UniProtKB/Swiss-Prot annotation:
Entries under InterPro entries matching the protein: tRNA_endonuc-like_dom_sf, tRNA_intron_Endo_cat-like_sf, tRNA_intron_Endonuc_cat-like, tRNA_splic, tRNA_splic_SEN34
Top class in the EC scheme: lyase
Catalytic activity: pretRNA = a 3'-half-tRNA molecule with a 5'-OH end + a 5'-half-tRNA molecule with a 2',3'-cyclic phosphate end + an intron with a 2',3'-cyclic phosphate and a 5'-hydroxyl terminus
Cellular compartment(s): Nucleus; Nucleus, Nucleolus
Physiological role: Constitutes one of the two catalytic subunit of the tRNA-splicing endonuclease complex, a complex responsible for identification and cleavage of the splice sites in pre-tRNA. It cleaves pre-tRNA at the 5'- and 3'-splice sites to release the intron. The products are an intron and two tRNA half-molecules bearing 2',3'-cyclic phosphate and 5'-OH termini. There are no conserved sequences at the splice sites, but the intron is invariably located at the same site in the gene, placing the splice sites an invariant distance from the constant structural features of the tRNA body.
Keyword presence, Nucleus: yes
Protein's UniProt keywords contain Nucleus: yes
Gene designation: Tsen34
Residue ranges, compositional bias (Polar residues): 144-159, 168-181
Active-site residues (renumbered): Y253, H261, K292
The protein, known as: tRNA-splicing endonuclease subunit Sen34
Length: 316
């Protein structure tokens, strides 16, 4: 089961796989609020953690898809231990990378060893052929005299000939085991970036039915109103997100927000609350100007939700 950490009314999802599962299987997108490690000074693209609306977190808890837990408060006395643990893990990662790099280089060297030996043999054979061709062009008498001086009476090669052979072999590189592998510089090593945070050991389950410091939404009329509408739209197959900058409660999408634009700006109104005409006109004009339809949502005592769509039509 997925885990959602709740602290001070904010519901956070820290795992990348959990975020993917919420979007693909449950139709809950949330909003990323974390800075990217390689782009911390911008806010156009954000990363983990994922911030859920209170209505999203409650819905997931009600259907049994997630477990809400209260995140433990950080203890400043443990910061030094956490930093030391992080540095140990980083050093271990660097050592593992150097070990893998050395193994890869040794494997590559073994693959090329046969080609190196063949190349050395071909080079040696070519030098011997060139030397034989030069000697064949000399006079027969001179060749016999030279041959007689290089060999002794018993047919053994002379000391000069013995010394020439190893000098030929030493002129070309000899394949053999490496005496050692130079470690990679720190600038060439990769720094592992965590994509998830382990579940806190001391985390305790959170009851969303009871109001607490971490979950102050329980029992609030505004939250109950928004939740009833959110769940009804979600059960109809819509994706929803926050719509604060559009003057509404939710943006309603026909599918994944990564593929579709929002079609509606949902405003939640209680059935007995009057709607000021000025707010109604301004919301309708705003929705039309951004090519969206204003959706007035009001839950009824029998549990059903009444929807009224509104578009502003200018005078012709």
């Amino acid at each position: 089961m997925l885990v959602v950490e709740v602290a001070n009314g904010r519901s956070l999802v820290w795992g990348a796989e959990a975020v993917q599962a919420l979007r693909e299987r449950l139709g809950v997108g949330g909003r990323t609020v974390g800075a990217l490690p390689r782009g911390p000074r911008q806010n156009s693209r954000l990363g983990l953690p994922l911030l859920l609306l209170p209505e999203e977190a409650r819905l997931l808890a009600e259907i049994g898809a997630v477990t809400l837990v209260s995140a433990p408060r950080p203890d400043p006395r443990n910061h030094g231990l956490a930093l030391a643990s992080f540095k140990r893990q980083q050093e271990q990662s660097f050592q593992d990378q150097n070990t893998l790099a050395a193994e890869a280089r040794e494997t590559r060297r073994q693959e090329l060893l046969e080609k190196i030996v063949e190349g050395q043999a071909a080079k040696k054979q070519k030098l011997e052929q060139d030397s034989g061709a030069d000697e064949g062009g000399q006079e027969a008498g001179g060749s016999e005299a030279t041959q007689g001086s290089e060999t002794s009476d018993d047919g053994q090669p002379s000391a000069e000939q013995e010394g020439a052979a190893p000098s030929l072999d030493s002129s070309s590189p000899q394949p053999g085991p490496s005496n050692g592998v130079t470690p990679l510089p720190r600038s060439a090593l990769l720094i592992q970036l965590a994509t998830a945070r382990p579940r806190p050991v001391k985390a305790k389950p959170l009851d969303w039915r009871v109001q607490s410091k971490d979950w102050p939404h329980a029992g609030r009329p505004a939250h109950e109103l928004r939740y009833s509408i959110y769940r009804d739209l979600w059960e109809r197959g819509f994706f929803l997100s926050a719509a604060g900058k559009f003057g509404g409660d939710f943006l309603v999408y026909p599918g994944d927000p990564l593929r579709f634009h929002a079609h509606y700006i949902a405003q939640c109104w209680s059935a007995e609350d009057p709607i000021p005409l000025q707010d109604l006109v301004s919301a309708g004009r705003l929705g039309t100007s951004v090519r969206k339809t204003l959706l007035l949502c009001s839950p009824q005592p029998d549990g059903k939700v009444v929807y009224t769509s509104l578009q502003w039509a200018s005078l012709q």
